[in-house]
Amino acid sequence: MKAMSLVFLVGLIGEFQVFSSASSPVNCQWDSYAPWSECNGCTKTQTRRRPVAVYGQYGGHPCVGSTFETQSCEPTRGCPTEEGCGERFRCFSGQCISKSLVCNGDSDCEEDSADEDRCEDSESRPSCDLSKPPPNIELTGNGYNALTGQFRNRVLNTKSFGGQCRKVFSGDGRDFYRLSGNVLSYTFQVKVNNDFNYEFYNSTWSYAKHTSTEHTSSSKGRVFIFSSSSSSSSYYAKTYEILKKKSYQLLVVQNTVEVAQFINNNPEFLQLAESFWKELSYLPPLYDYSAYRRLIDQYGTHYLQSGSLGGEYKVLFYVDSEKVAESDLGSEDKKKCASSHISFLFKSSKHKCKAMEEALKSASGTQSNVLRGVPFVRGGRPGFVSGLSYLELDNPDGNKQRYSSWAGSVTDLPQVIKQKLTPLYELVKEVPCASVKRLYLKRALEEYLDEFDSCHCQPCQNGGMASVEGTQCQCHCKPNTFGVACEQGVLVGDHAGGIDGGWSCWSSWGPCAQGKKTRSRKCNNPPPSGGGKSCIGETSESRQCEDEDLEHLRLLEPHCFPLSLVPTEFCPSPPALKDGFVQNEETTFPVGKNIVYSCNEGYSLVGDPVARCGEDLQWTVGKMHCQKIACVLPTLMRGLQSHPQKPFYTVGEKVTFSCSSGMSLEGPSTFLCGSSLKWSPEMKNVQCVRKEAPLAKKVPECQLWEKLQNSKCVCKMPYECGSSLDVCARDERSKRILRLTVCKMHVLQCQGRNYTLSVGETCTLPGSAEKACGACPLWEKCDAQSSKCVCRAASECEEAGFRVCVEVNGREQTMTECEAGVLRCLGLSITVTSIRPCAPEAP
């Protein structure tokens, strides 16, 4: 976590003469809206954005209203999430995951559990005996806005274990936890530092300089000021009115509390959160700053590479400058009064420290021993936070107890602290045109940083430093100056004698000449005066008219660029590679498109893996083949189980086959991977056959959730269910709430799976939507005139479905699925309380 801090503002102002005239307030003004973005084929909406034309300053009003507008539209392109996944498994959402994660007992499809939806017990291979993740692990997957210091929406799927079974032990909780597949390392280690660190700053200008991180963009000489603390924006907002009236010194007292430390995996191995993956899919393949800027607003500028979990405390107190001046309190005296055994957390009787207490009380407008401050607290229980907003000067034990109570609660409710960041564009992958979108997101991030460059602000007087906060500019004043524009007071000491120059914003890029374009800036914001220093850096810069990376991608992925620049002819599907596949296979292959082959597990590719769609609409494929490097199992027939289960086996390893219950094995049971990479004995004629049973005298009558197989009633598979009533169900094994149907619940219970109707916890059931004839559920019929499905009357039910118990208007009654569906179709609120008929009422 950022340091826990007690910040004391010490004013050193006596009487000031007015140095400059007051600046008139400047109100924020919006610029015009940009054109509408391309219509999104998935959401069928388009957006547009308006930038700030004039930032509010000198006490002027901020801009009011939203930056974005959204409207419905008719798309001309399809939805990328509806495309296939090639050799990978496709979740219901459209996200692709490795087939090795299917039927492993974990829900690796984040929102829909599609990878576990159609698994028979004989197919399910639980990869671990533990599924409990570390507490608060979801915090490690959040995005982060480095400009505002705020955490944003989740970008990493912290719920997926990636098929791994890595465990970590918590000595505090005395329990084992299973690590997410995205986390490389997670350590439970509580670090509490009881010694506070004290730093003094002679002005808000010095403090702003220290607590900001300079970042130079790819545009040489451009400097952006980033907030390094999540509380910085709040600090400037809450102290703005006070800092207009006096010049203050600052004393910062720092400390840290940590409860756990984590390191996330490298970008190429991270699984994206489904919502973030969808937004990446929705991004247009053409550069549209509004669309990419909206993604930055939602998910931030960076993701977490590593960090700790803990809490943050910062409180600001103001000190009467005249009282401090009268007491002749020097810098060392102030530090001693706020540290060691005479800290504000402890009692002090020294004369000069008593004078500092009086100065604190005078600035607070109170004569009591209770000092109210401006707190900034992250982490810990909210009930303890309110007690950190004040100090009792005569009750150091009480101060210490309130602090200790809050610090102890950080273990239960931590936040991410001490984070190390990686740019968000590193996560752009696994979506169509990923390389192009990654480059565009990087470009959008630079434009986003440009919006917050202080060059947009008018100069502060007396050498003050301007910064952009939202839609306003704030001035941070040098020592002995104050006011909304730092217009009051005088510069003294090292700061007197001159005003350093500041850069204007870069101009727009000029026209291309000889393959290059140029832009410029001036050192006039403000110009240097009174012997001040000139700006550091170049007044102009040039670059190639066409981005080299973009040109390279235009060759590799021409289909991601405007249609006027790409061919309209396509190659057929690429030739198949024995024991191999095409990486990230798509549905169309325009002229110039390159593809890359890979081999299945147990094989290694020999030769050139790249093939190209030529102008003759034929594939140019070099010599390549997949060379066997291990023994691989053939496709196993239904019911046949292998042990150990591995994607491939090295020389000398054995595999043993067995059959599920009710089946017997025909053929050898154990096989050896030989030096020739062939199985010994040869793997053929190995199968599971049903054990002989006496012939049934008559065909049994099966339940609705059963089917007849080999003269026996067996459980159906969930996908064999037809139209059935939607319900919310709870998986008692994973404790997840899922959307199922009455039929699927019967089938799963028949298979021995423990699903119950959820009580008090709901899922999102599909709303009523128009369906074409041929897709009507039990409770709807086809309207010949409109060719659409419409609600039946209860008396028109042709297929009853299951008999269920339904609560209608507070009363339970038994009815068929069709009858219940009719009520729901007509808009009545019904609740399925049991997938079986209601229990008879007691007489």
Curated annotation (Swiss-Prot):
Kindly indicate whether the keyword Membrane belongs to this entry.
yes
Q: Where is the Sushi domain?
A: 569-628, 629-690
**Carbohydrate attachment sites?**
W36, N202, W503, W506, W509, N754
Signal peptide (residue range): 1-22
Which keywords appear in this protein's UniProt record, sorted alphabetically?
Complement alternate pathway, Complement pathway, Cytolysis, Disulfide bond, EGF-like domain, Glycoprotein, Immunity, Innate immunity, Membrane, Membrane attack complex, Repeat, Secreted, Signal, Sushi, Target cell membrane, Target membrane
Query: Per its record, how is this protein called by name?
Result: Complement component C7
Question: Where does the UniProt annotation locate this protein?
Answer: Secreted; Target cell membrane
- Ranges for the region named Disordered are 105-142, 516-539
Residue ranges of every copy of the TSP type-1 domain listed in the record: 27-80, 500-549
**UniProt region (Factor I module (FIM) 1), positions on chain:** 695-770
What is the name of the gene encoding this protein?
C7
UniProt note on tissues of expression? Detected in plasma (at protein level). Bone marrow, heart, intestine, lung, spleen, kidney, liver and thymus.
Question: What InterPro entries does the annotation carry?
Answer: C7_FIM2_N, C7_KAZAL, FacI_MAC, Kazal_3, LDL_receptor-like_sf, LDLR_class-A_CS, LDrepeatLR_classA_rpt, MAC_perforin
Question: Does the entry annotate any disulfide bonds, and if so which pairs?
Answer: C28-C63, C39-C73, C42-C79, C85-C96, C91-C109, C103-C119, C128-C165, C337-C353, C433-C560, C455-C505, C457-C473, C460-C475, C477-C486, C512-C545, C523-C535, C571-C613, C599-C626, C631-C673, C659-C688, C702-C713, C715-C750, C721-C743, C728-C763, C773-C782, C776-C789, C791-C825, C797-C818, C805-C838
According to the entry, every stretch annotated as the LDL-receptor class A domain falls at 83-121
Taken from the record, one Pfam family name reads: MACPF
